[in-house]
């Protein structure tokens, strides 16, 4: 994890907000050795850990049962990349490892945004949750109080079928998380749902989205349209929190304009007795 609470002051700090390594070391190294840094979730003592594989993060003591202590490096690097990307759009309105006091939420929410009256929760999956009820209860807890929840998967969960880039073999959690978005219904196919993944390819972080995925809960495969973009180039909808590819912004604007014209055309038909005359 990247966020800690100061035992002495209650201050919450995130390593990713420090861009100079020496400043980060001065802030956390000695304090961790003195037992002054606490986990945001379990309030156990943590220390700063430096790794060549992922950004500096905090490490629990051995044999900790805290769920934050058992996250994979894949999960941590995805969390770090997503947080950094969200900060470009929402700046100080983004919170990493947000702690929700709800028994159905086993760990911190990876990224939390409160922006202009809207609240977005980003929850990363790095492994399958087998229990159907557990998945449903988690979603209900994350979407309370009109929170818009976005599920994101690490790329190692993505299983494609053969050479067909648009065909995936989803886990139970991926089937559960498939969501119908405006970028599915505004597509030419006008059906299906979306799944999104973040991963590292050729030393760059990428966003992979599957749009218009067709397949019910009993299907072994889903088929749809695959899109891939460097995460740094991905757009963010400021009112919904959706992660979108650059070409989707223009495409959806065109389709919305077209649909608005069609609605106006339907409304203005003179032989419809319920239509207002403009």
Locate each region found by the language model.
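Short beta-alpha junction loops
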Residues: 153-159
